[in-house]
């Protein structure tokens, strides 16, 4: 395509004369016929291209194929007007000898025809022919048409500037989209593991044969072999001694467990490991437990028990039963674990031999087996729940149903979800609900405002312990902004503007080159602009500040042009930071440069006008002239007075806008709910068009700031050191920068609020903001504070809210040059339709569950905090008013260090159970006192005003389950291998039955009884002379004979065990001393032996005594004869240990494969633990908690589905 003709240029005569007097270039033709008055014609240019064999289409839009570019017409075809001063300078230079002509003047010569060599005006490279130079221009400089009119020095500066900004390609949309996907994926991965389904049995207690059966009749032996041969699982254990053992998830099927198990061995093994989680490491032996920390460890064991059972009973395939008694009943098939079938429905079994198990199973009600009168399919859809009768213990079922209540409280209805998404997306998405959504969906995505506010306070707690943790939140939001914004940064906008400036100067430093050098990003910080915007959403956690390296040297003066440029760049960039002191800092940066000609009063001890500007970072050091510009005399300091007036008049006015959804809750602490504060004025987003604006706050700030520095350049103070030509050049550069058509001001006013509103609704950490205070000294926020303790229970200054944990805030230095380039070089697509763009950009944000992750974490934070605080409070006598079911278990009054250890144990348990990475309650245990843990946040202003918010947690579902578990533990502690009541050490020889854990009579003696002595606090022995036996000193300090009845508190026994072993225990074995050891609760073990052989438990007791020390004791050993199914001749046995009260509730049955027990403990299957199976009067849906754990009952199995957000609603904008 032929190029369009150039317009005829009309120039002044004076300019023509100046051009004719310019000396020719060194490589100009020696011909005397040199045309110096006109440019080559269009025809001549086309002819030259044809000779060179160049297609006109290859020449480019800039006309680089011309034989010689015109020096009087710019790229847009406008006439270049040359100032008279430049013409005079050219005439003067023409009279100089050739030796003094500089390169800048030489390269500005009008090209001559027929040169010997062709020189590139961009890079000064020489070429032998026009075709070679044209090809060079086409390949190397085609994208830089504006540089064809600039000098090589400026061109070199432009090249360096553009190369420095070449890293902007790293922020290209394709890279940012990848970052967006990674962020959303990582956010989903950060969500707590709320859904764990179990298709197995809902039970945490296993029925095991603790002692295998022996001495069975031949018929029973044959039947047992038959069942084993065909791998038939007996419905009930058939050992000689069968016990109920706590073992969570032993019958689970489906999803993996939560990573926490409570698996206690039968009492024949040592179980102390479960009761030494905390306050034991390093000083309690592996075979011991500490009675003084028993409550804390029991609480943690029960917490683990609850957390391991936070599951949903999942429905599975049902099949029709074909057994005789229960034919036609619908039962679960348990295809993956068929051995569970016999255990789940023991009432289906028909045992051929009359045994204890058979007698019990004969009482089973057939209708209490399998599914209860409810179809599994309703209207062609699987029903949401199915009620079944099967093996399930009531405590586990209660915990799981309580957890389901928690999930239901978090459920979001699809209609509400669409409302939330539309409001969070500012109605830029076209979303709807599919009409065929099933009623069985469960979307646990909701968190109340109270939970979100608590989570925000916890974020502040964790960040105040580690300020570096706040910076990744800004980086993440910065990446999201770059992923969705249509604004791109194009530095060539700036270079194209300033290269039209004529630079005729004798200065050694080119002004244009210097400003381009200063505008290069420091440290390749291309994203400083986006970091500033992201920091606005977290201005309570992160504070963007101008980098100290960017400030001019305070020892320089205003006549040092690089320092003046730096001051201007700081001033332009300052409103983009969230630093409340940035206006003062930029004011003082100019005051530093004007310290000698324009002195002002500082009125702060130790600070002067020459103090580096970056040190003015507190309202108390703001100069009075800045606070009130009227205090700066115009005659004495005209520039500083004008600068202060400019800042006060044009500094942007903060605003706010709506974000999020009221239905989603709000985590704002200091800002009204669902509002986001903004440091600039904002306006609604135009839906259809965009256009550059020149009346916005940012446009005004850029224009007035540059206008002020034009005044500085032309001020009388600059005249002695800056010549007129330099001032004109600088004025031209500033004017060009002021007139740049950038889209950034429009973006800040109209588009950025929408982006922040949408992204702030989906980020993992919600916006954490404090108000922007502009320029009012008394309103300036000096600290954001957090207290980890209850304000009503603070006892010393070390935990005072003003003395600790100030976190305003983590400083994030940013490069002002990068910010200024972004302000001046913003660009959007010419055909941009904002509603279409944002509809596509925001759609991926709402296709996953990422936006609800923070809600889920907020709920788990609440649950963990309530449980941790309650557990710590239960380990002391005062503190928070919480229920204390386990107050009877011994526990020393914990210190703050011990409380911190307990707190971390609970925190780790919750993080493991819900698979949470990162911090949960970590910061709460690092400082302060967890015994009075409570959270208050506040911000402190300069005038002393404190805005405080107390954020107490709401009620906790898991804590409710924990309290019920604690109360149940008191009634069923034998199921956890824990005994209650004292123990006796009394010699008891017998040939008969012996049941040490089931005393059949009243205790032999008790404290306060006749002739009962209580040992003193130290168990001190009083030695007597002349062969008399030693005496024990009682609690009244009176020596008493050892023979007799003694009360020994366990702590006294621990500190005097050596005395007891040497002097008291031998008399117990001899039958002369009876001892009652006062120990309210203890871990025990059982030791079974054959009654036909001689036996004594003295050795067991001596081993037990040898393991006692002041730090702990081993489990209490009880010796029990094995129950016999036939007549036997027993031997004499001597026992020394038995319990003061019944501790045999974990005994399920004895010799259940026979009809009776002839000798030893005799226990059949208790109907009290199976009312739902055998009691005709059983009320469905009831249980006997906390008094008894039943092992069979009715439960609901659920067919929930858990869709993603894209499965709940349909978005057309996502296509």
From Swiss-Prot:
Keywords: ATP-binding, Capsid protein, Helicase, Hydrolase, Inner capsid protein, Metal-binding, mRNA capping, mRNA processing, Nucleotide-binding, T=2 icosahedral capsid protein, Virion, Zinc, Zinc-finger. It is found in: Virion. It comes from the Viruses. Residues 21-44 have a biased composition (Low complexity). GO terms for cellular component: T=2 icosahedral viral capsid; viral inner capsid. It holds the Pfam family zf-C2H2_6. The keyword Zinc applies. Residues 1-81 are annotated as: Disordered. A zinc finger (C2H2-type) spans 118-141. GO terms for molecular function: ATP binding; hydrolase activity; RNA helicase activity; zinc ion binding. One of its GO terms (biological process) is 7-methylguanosine mRNA capping. The keyword Glycoprotein does not apply. Belongs to the turreted BTV-fold inner capsid family. Inner capsid protein that self-assembles to form an icosahedral capsid with a T=2 symmetry, which consists of 120 copies of VP2, with channels at each of its five-fold vertices. This capsid constitutes the innermost concentric layer of the viral mature particle. Homodecamer; each decamer is made up of two conformers of VP2, called VP2A and VP2B. 12 homodecamers assemble to form an icosahedral capsid. Interacts with VP6. This is Inner capsid protein VP3. The gene is S3.
């Amino acid at each position: 395509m032929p190029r369009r003709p150039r317009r005829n240029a009309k120039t002044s005569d004076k300019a023509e004369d100046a051009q004719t007097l310019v000396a020719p270039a060194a490589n100009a033709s020696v011909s005397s016929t040199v045309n110096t008055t006109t440019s080559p014609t269009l025809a001549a240019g086309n002819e030259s291209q044809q000779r060179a064999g160049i297609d006109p289409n290859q020449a480019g839009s800039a006309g680089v194929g011309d034989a010689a570019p015109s020096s009087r017409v710019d790229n847009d075809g406008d006439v270049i007007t040359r100032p008279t001063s430049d013409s005079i300078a050219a005439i003067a230079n023409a009279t100089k000898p050739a030796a003094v002509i500089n390169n800048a003047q030489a390269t500005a010569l009008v090209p001559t025809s027929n040169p010997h060599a062709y020189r590139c005006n961009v890079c000064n490279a020489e070429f032998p022919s026009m075709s070679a130079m044209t090809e060079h221009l086409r390949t190397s400089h085609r994208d830089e048409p504006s540089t064809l009119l600039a000098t090589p020095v400026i061109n070199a500066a432009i090249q360096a500037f553009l190369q420095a900004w070449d890293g902007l390609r790293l922020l290209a949309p394709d890279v940012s989209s990848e970052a967006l996907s990674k962020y959303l994926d990582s956010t989903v991965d950060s969500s707590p593991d709320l859904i764990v389904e179990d298709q197995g049995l809902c039970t945490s207690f296993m029925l095991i044969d603790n002692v295998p059966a022996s001495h069975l009749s031949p018929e029973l032996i044959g039947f047992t072999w038959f069942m084993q041969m065909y791998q038939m699982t007996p419905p009930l254990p058939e050992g000689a001694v069968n016990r109920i053992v706590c073992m969570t998830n032993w019958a689970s099927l489906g999803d993996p467990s939560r990573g926490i198990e409570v698996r206690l061995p039968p009492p024949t093994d040592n179980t102390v490991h479960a009761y030494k989680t905390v306050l034991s490491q390093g000083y309690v032996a592996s075979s011991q437990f500490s009675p003084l920390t028993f409550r804390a460890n029991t609480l943690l064991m029960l917490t683990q028990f609850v957390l391991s059972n936070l599951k949903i009973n999942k429905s599975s395939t049902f099949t029709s039963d074909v057994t005789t008694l229960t034919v036609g009943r619908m039962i679960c098939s348990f295809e993956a674990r068929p051995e569970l079938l016999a255990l789940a429905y023991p009432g289906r079994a028909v045992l051929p031999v009359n045994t204890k198990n058979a007698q019990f199973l004969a009482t089973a009600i057939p209708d209490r087996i399998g599914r209860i009168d409810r179809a599994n399919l309703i209207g062609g859809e699987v029903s949401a729940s199915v009620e079944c009768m099967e093996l399930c213990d009531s405590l586990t079922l209660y915990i799981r149903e309580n957890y389901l209540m928690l999930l239901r409280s978090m459920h979001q209805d699809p209609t509400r979800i669409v409302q939330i998404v539309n409001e969070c997306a500012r109605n830029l998405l076209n979303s709807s609900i599919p009409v065929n959504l099933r009623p069985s969906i469960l979307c646990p995505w909701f968190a109340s405002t109270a939970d979100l506010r608590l989570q925000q306070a916890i974020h502040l707690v964790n960040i105040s312990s580690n300020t570096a943790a706040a910076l990744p939140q800004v980086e993440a939001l910065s990446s999201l902004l770059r992923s969705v914004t249509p604004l791109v940064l194009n530095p060539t906008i700036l270079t194209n503007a300033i290269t039209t400036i004529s630079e005729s100067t004798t200065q050694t430093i080119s002004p244009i080159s210097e400003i381009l050098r200063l505008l290069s990003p420091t440290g390749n910080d291309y994203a400083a602009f986006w970091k500033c915007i992201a920091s606005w959403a977290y201005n309570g956690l992160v504070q963007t500040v101008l980098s100290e390296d960017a400030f001019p040297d305070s020892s320089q003066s205003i006549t040092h042009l690089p320092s003046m440029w730096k001051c201007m760049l700081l001033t332009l960039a300052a409103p983009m930071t969230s630093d409340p002191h940035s206006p003062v800092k930029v004011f003082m940066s100019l005051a530093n440069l004007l310290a000698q000609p324009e002195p002002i009063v500082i009125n702060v001890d130790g600070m002067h006008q020459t103090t580096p500007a970056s040190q003015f970072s507190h309202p108390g050091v703001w100069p009075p002239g800045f606070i009130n510009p009227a205090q700066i005399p115009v005659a004495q300091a005209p520039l500083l007075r004008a600068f202060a007036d400019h800042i006060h008049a044009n500094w942007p006015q903060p605003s706010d806008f709506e974000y999020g959804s009221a239905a989603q809750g709000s985590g704002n602490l200091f800002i009204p709910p669902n509002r986001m504060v903004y440091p600039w004025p904002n306006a609604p987003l135009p839906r259809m068009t965009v256009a550059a604006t020149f009346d916005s706050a940012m446009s005004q700030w850029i224009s007035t700031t540059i206008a002020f520095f034009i005044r500085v350049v032309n001020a009388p103070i600059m005249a002695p050191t800056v010549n007129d030509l330099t001032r004109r050049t600088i004025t031209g550069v500033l004017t060009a920068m002021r007139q740049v058509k950038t889209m950034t001001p429009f973006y800040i006013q109209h588009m950025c609020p929408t982006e922040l509103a949408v992204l702030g609704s989906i980020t993992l950490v919600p916006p954490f903001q404090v108000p922007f205070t502009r320029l009012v000294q008394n309103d300036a926020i000096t600290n954001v504070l957090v207290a980890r303790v209850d304000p009503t229970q603070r006892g010393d200054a070390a935990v005072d809210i003003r003395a600790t944990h100030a976190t305003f805030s983590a400083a994030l230095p940013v490069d002002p040059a990068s910010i200024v380039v972004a302000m001046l070089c913003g660009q959007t697509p010419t055909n941009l339709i904002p509603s279409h763009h944002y509809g596509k950009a925001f759609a991926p944000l709402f296709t996953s569950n990422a936006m609800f992750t923070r809600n889920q974490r907020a709920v788990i934070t609440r649950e963990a905090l309530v449980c941790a605080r309650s557990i710590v409070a239960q380990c002391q006598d005062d503190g928070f008013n919480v229920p204390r079911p386990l107050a009877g278990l011994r526990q020393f009054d914990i210190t703050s260090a011990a409380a911190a250890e307990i707190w971390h144990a609970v925190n780790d348990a919750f993080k493991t159970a819900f698979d949470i990475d990162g911090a949960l309650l970590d910061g709460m245990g690092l400082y302060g006192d967890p015994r009075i843990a409570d959270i208050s946040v506040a911000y402190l202003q300069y005038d002393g005003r404190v805005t405080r918010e107390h954020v107490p947690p709401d009620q906790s579902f898991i804590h409710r389950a924990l309290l019920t578990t604690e109360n149940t533990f008191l009634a069923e502690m034998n199921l956890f291998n824990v005994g209650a009541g004292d123990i006796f050490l009394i010699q008891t020889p017998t040939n008969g039955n012996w049941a040490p854990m089931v005393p059949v009579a009243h205790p032999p003696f008790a404290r306060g009884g006749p002739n009962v002595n209580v040992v003193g606090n130290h168990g001190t022995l009083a030695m007597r002379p002349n062969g008399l036996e030693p005496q024990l000193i009682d609690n009244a300090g009176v020596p008493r004979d050892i023979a007799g009845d003694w009360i020994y508190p366990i702590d006294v026994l621990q500190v005097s065990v050596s005395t007891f072993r040497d002097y008291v225990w031998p008399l117990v074995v001899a039958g002369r001393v009876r001892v009652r050891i006062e120990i309210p609760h203890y871990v025990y073990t059982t030791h079974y032996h054959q009654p036909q052989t001689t036996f004594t438990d003295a050795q067991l007791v001596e081993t037990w005594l040898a393991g006692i020390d002041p730090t702990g004791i081993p489990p209490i050993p009880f010796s029990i004869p094995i129950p016999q199914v036939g007549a036997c001749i027993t031997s004499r046995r001597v026992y020394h240990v038995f319990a003061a009260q019944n501790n045999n509730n974990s005994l399920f049955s004895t010799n259940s494969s026979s009809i009776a027990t002839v000798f030893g403990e005799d226990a059949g299957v208790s109907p009290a633990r199976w009312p739902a199976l055998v009691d005709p009067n059983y009320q469905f849906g009831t249980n006997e908690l906390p008094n008894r754990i039943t092992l069979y009952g009715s439960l609901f199995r659920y067919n929930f589905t858990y869709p993603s957000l894209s499965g709940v609603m349909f978005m057309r904008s996502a296509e």
